[in-house]
């Protein structure tokens, strides 16, 4: 798998992004100002996963969206994307946070990737 930073035509990945965030209006708010990473299959014919990371200022970056195409799920590609992003941003910021829903499965996934639960934003 190959991961690429996409800087133009980001909306073409909207269907994948909607898997992680059901509100297109919210996606629009962070997509253009964020870095969009796309993981492709080996032949670059199909996007496997997407992630958006935003600059929140003061050395903080936030993983706003992480989605894996349904037929690629539960094969380690989400974790591979998170590991790539952690490595990519380790010298860029001092903190990488995750903004996510409060489902047990999602929180557990990020904790298994090394993130620490800090608070409920509600």
Model-predicted segments: where are they?
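Short amphipathic alpha-helix that is part of the acyltransferase structural core
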Residues: 1-26, 40
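Conserved GNAT acetyl-CoA-binding A-motif
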Residues: 89-102
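Conserved acetyl-CoA pyrophosphate-binding loop and the N-cap/start of the following alpha-helix
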Residues: 72, 76-84
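Conserved beta-strand in the GNAT
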Residues: 38, 45-55, 59-67
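A short, internal acetyl-CoA/4′-phosphopantetheine-binding micro-motif in the GNAT/acyltransferase core
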Residues: 66-73, 101
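Conserved active-site alpha-helix within GNAT-family acetyltransferase domains
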Residues: 79, 102-122
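N-terminal first-folded block
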Residues: 19-36, 51
